């Protein structure tokens, strides 16, 4: 079966340009139809899927998640404790001090990020409130002007001049005598 670039892009979850780039990286022979569109076979699709999945797995393995939780910190502490048993007490104290400073820094950074997020939300809420108050003022002004205006009388619909029926022209009396 033949597939076009947009279909494969949708399957892989990438852009059509990325599909062409992946095909070039895999050295696939890409055929074009009479309109200049790339045509891929089922084998090409399978190869690209395998390649794309392997790339995703690679990127996930090389880039661990940035979230740190208390469980992760505790796990690191236990790992450090096992290593420390083999190291002298002086080195152990240095490592624990470094670990404590790092955890404090992480906690501070998390608090700062949370504070910034809260500040952004607060600013957005205040902005929305201001906009709503401005809209309310405009509505009140419009209501006041409508109340001041005299009542509007609705006139019956009349057709515009260009749509009115034309009255037949009266023939001149002389023409009617001669039958013209």
Swiss-Prot record:
InterPro entries the record matches: Chrosome_anchoring_RacA
Keywords, ordered alphabetically: Cell cycle, Cell division, Chromosome partition, Coiled coil, Cytoplasm, DNA-binding, Sporulation
GO cellular component: cytoplasm
UniProt GO MF annotations: double-stranded DNA binding
Positions in coiled-coil regions: 89-151
Chief location category: cytoplasm
DNA-binding region, residues: 5-25
Annotated SUPFAM superfamilies: Influenza hemagglutinin (stalk)
Gene Ontology biological-process annotations: asymmetric cell division; chromosome condensation; chromosome segregation; sporulation resulting in formation of a cellular spore
Protein name stated in the entry: Chromosome-anchoring protein RacA
Gene name of the record: racA
């Amino acid at each position: 079966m033949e597939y076009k670039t947009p279909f494969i892009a949708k399957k892989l979850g990438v852009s059509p340009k990325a599909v062409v780039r992946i095909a070039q990286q895999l050295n696939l022979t890409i055929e074009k139809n009479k309109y200049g569109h790339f045509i891929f076979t089922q084998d090409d699709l399978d190869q690209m899927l395998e390649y794309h999945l392997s790339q995703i797995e690679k990127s996930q393995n090389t880039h661990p998640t940035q979230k740190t939780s208390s469980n992760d910190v505790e796990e690191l502490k236990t790992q450090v404790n096992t290593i420390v048993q083999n190291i002298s007490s002086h080195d152990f104290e240095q490592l624990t001090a470094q670990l404590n400073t790092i955890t404090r820094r992480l906690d501070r950074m998390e608090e700062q990020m949370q504070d910034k997020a809260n500040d952004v939300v607060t600013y957005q809420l205040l902005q929305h409130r201001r906009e709503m108050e401005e809209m309310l003022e405009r509505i009140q002004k419009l209501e006041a002007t409508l109340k001041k205006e005299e009542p509007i009388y609705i006139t019956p619909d009349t057709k515009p001049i260009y749509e009115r029926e034309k009255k037949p022209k009266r023939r001149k009396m002389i023409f009617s005598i001669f039958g013209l």
